[in-house]
Amino acid sequence: MCESYSRSLLRVSVAQICQALGWDSVQLSACHLLTDVLQRYLQQLGRGCHRYSELYGRTDPILDDVGEAFQLMGVNLHELEDYIHNIEPVTFPHQIPSFPVSKNNVLQFPQPGSKDAEERKDYIPDYLPPIVSSQEEEEEEQVPTDGGTSAEAMQVPLEEDDEMEEEEVINDENFLGKRPLDSPEVEEMPSMKRPRLLSTKGDSLDVVLLEAREPLSSINPQKTPPVLSPVRVQDRADLAPPSPQPPMLAPFAKSQLPIAKPLETKSFTPKTKTKASSPGQKTKSPKAALSPARLGSPIRSPKTIPKEKKSPGRSKSPKSPKSPKIVAHVPQTPVRPETPNRTPSAMVVEKTVKETIPVMKPTQTPPEVVKLNIEMQPKKPVVTDKTIDDSIDAVIARACAEREPDPFEFSSGSESEGDTFTSPKRISGSECATPKASTSSNNFTKSLATPLPLSSGTSSSDNSWTMDASIDEVVRKAKLGAPSNMPPTFPYISSPSISPPTPEPLHKGYEEKAKLPSSVDVKKKLKKELKTKLKKKEKQRDRERERERNKERSKEKDKMREREKEKEAGKELKYPWRELMKDEDSDPYKFKIKEFEDIDAAKVRLKDGIVRREREKHKDKKKDRERSKREKDKRERERLKEKNREDKIKAPPTQLVLPPKEMALPLFSPSAVRVPAMLPAFSPMLPEKLFEEKEKPKEKERKKDKKEKKKKKEKEKEKEKKEREREKERREREKREKEKEKHKHEKIKVEPVIPAPSPVIPRLTLRVGAGQDKIVISKVVPAPEAKPAPSLNRPKTPPPAPVPIPVRVSPTPLQPPLLTQAAVCPALMPSPAPALSGIGSAKAPVRSVVTETVSTYVIRDEWGNQIWICPGCNKPDDGSPMIGCDDCDDWYHWPCVGIMAAPPEEMQWFCPKCANKIKKDKKHKKRKHRAH
């Protein structure tokens, strides 16, 4: 009543405005369109005002909110003011009652002298109504049938439904003739109440499940167009009360109702919906059973919806001339029983279930429908989950895209949705593309212009078309002989773009819906499915966790096995160097890589061993300790071997004998002196002792004692060798010193004393061996000035080289490969070559030559000072901390080698080049050892 009344008033207003502008007459089609536009315009204006008032924290809008709403709609307030002043005011044709309209007091507050007032407890405030008596409760229970707040209230007796359908068919046809001009919205306007029906329709069930909507009536009661036929009016009267049940619930009931009829005759199922689609569509083919979206105008199929709402059993749906057949089946409509199940609470439950599991959608279908749905569910439940989610995402995305506010674009679909602005163009494009499927889905989402709405028409349980479904539909169409896809003929004159093509036939959807089980069964099944899904997920999680645990266990087992193997190998090896030869993985990095590879292989194999792990954990710890000790021992032994070899090589070359005065001087020049002759043998032993002290577990003291004894023996042997070598060196030195004294006396007599070397004196550098060493020939200052203090400690910043030192020669490695093997690099030690050159230079009366073997990265400046160059950055020593390689004696800046803090003194450090060479040498040794 409200819709028809408001629309009639708007029509009068349109006529008055036209008269004021000078028009004498108006075509009915134009009048209907203008009325529809005015209605939408006022609705959007009201929405804008309300939203602005809420935005600023007000419950009631004020003029400022109205002004903001006008601006949002593109209306200039100044122009509007001028228009009002320049045009005579149009009086309203009817007197409008002042709101709120006076009503009888239904609260029944007790009068002061009544019994209720006397019996009323003191603690009950006066503003609370009295407790309802049992009689009143009984009366109230009867009210819902009239109120239509629940699905039951909306239902009509089956007998009436049959009659209603016949009447509706007639009315629709008549209506087409009578009001071809009604804009789709006019029919759609009832969508306020009908949107629920649409959603409830089997076709729209999926959509409904996907997105919950508020009934259009609750949003815009005025929006629905006046009832076109008496039957519809009655339906509206029934539907008018539709309480704000969750839109989802109502749609389910609706869907079930239409399904009940199709159950009896699947071929007719489309009929119910075809009528709703449009008068043209209704006549065309019940087979086309347009999805609720199709029903009514493309934007919204409100007419169809209200029709369906009129008969919850859907008996009323006169969607096609064949609807009388449906009427025959109407008595079957067990839809009513379903509708009672859809009380607000039940509907809410269904709504939640549907949201969680789209397959459950048909919960509210009638028993017959339930059966059909039961058949259909096993096929489509899986598909629906994914497809529904995808469709929902698509719908949401499209809705977001379409929600750009455009004050001038109006769409009934958007109004039903509650979207203030949606352009008709959008509606026409998307809705036409998805023939009215979006309209059916409008109850849930305006943007349901995606293929989902269409699919919803085809099957509520299926959101996506399958090959089988499409084939079945084609066959059905052929049997029915009615083109389901015939374009609907719209008598309405609405925006031409809005008239949508008829959607694909809903036959399959109806059949599937009919197959759906009863709401109770469906709920149970849904709950079971949810539980099973949750259980499956939990099982999967547990499995994944177990797999991860197994992987970790397998890794630990692999590590344990490797450690055990290493222990066994260590026990079998009598000599440490053999152990080194056999261990290809002496490099800790390589060892780690192997562990990971083994672990990867073992992950697949090992799944047991929880008990073993606990036992092996302790073993692992012990093995790790033993490993580290073994590796350290191996390294130390290698170093000792290399040192011994170097010493042997160094010993044979003859050394110059220094005079007794200079006996205290080190054998090597300060640049080359990193470690005194006695130190190389002992230096490697220090780290061993330190590491041993740190890692001594009580259990392994015995093993350590044995190792220490072996080490002591080796040390003693080395000491003896060194002492012998020293004695030889001393003898040679004495001989050389004697010769040097003779030469020096001659030089002193001939040469004047030179206070400092002149920068002009040329220097010669000769490369020796593999380019590691250079022979630097420079001028020598007289002996008296040469008494520099020997520097035994390696400086972090290389020390300046003292210039005046008599000719000194010390052994250097004979073969460049040995340099890489040596634990202590002899690279900076003077080479034997200088001895000869020194002797030869003694003959020269003026100058003597000092030869020193200097690293390629050490330079002497004009005054003879040594400057270290970092091989990493090729920049000289700038005072920043540097670290020297224990093999080649090249000095690197810390940042160039990635060192942040100084390493411990006991620990040897090798540059990248030397480290690689040592690794290669170790491998080579191992190969040789194996060959033997």
From Swiss-Prot:
Keywords: Acetylation, Isopeptide bond, Metal-binding, Nucleus, Phosphoprotein, Transcription, Transcription regulation, Ubl conjugation, Zinc, Zinc-finger
Superkingdom of source: Eukaryota
GO biological process: maintenance of protein location in nucleus; mRNA transcription by RNA polymerase II; negative regulation of signal transduction by p53 class mediator; negative regulation of transcription by RNA polymerase II; positive regulation of transcription initiation by RNA polymerase II; regulation of transcription by RNA polymerase II; RNA polymerase II preinitiation complex assembly; transcription by RNA polymerase II
Record-listed Phosphoserine modification sites: 183, 199, 229, 243, 291, 297, 301, 669, 758
Comp. bias regions, Low complexity: 408-423, 447-461
Crosslink (Glycyl lysine isopeptide (Lys-Gly) (interchain with G-Cter in SUMO2)) position: 582, 749
Positions with biased composition (Polar residues): 266-283, 436-446
Subcellular localization: Nucleus
PANTHER family: TRANSCRIPTION INITIATION FACTOR TFIID SUBUNIT 3 (PTHR46452:SF1)
Function: The TFIID basal transcription factor complex plays a major role in the initiation of RNA polymerase II (Pol II)-dependent transcription. TFIID recognizes and binds promoters with or without a TATA box via its subunit TBP, a TATA-box-binding protein, and promotes assembly of the pre-initiation complex (PIC). The TFIID complex consists of TBP and TBP-associated factors (TAFs), including TAF1, TAF2, TAF3, TAF4, TAF5, TAF6, TAF7, TAF8, TAF9, TAF10, TAF11, TAF12 and TAF13. The TFIID complex structure can be divided into 3 modules TFIID-A, TFIID-B, and TFIID-C.
The protein, known as: Transcription initiation factor TFIID subunit 3
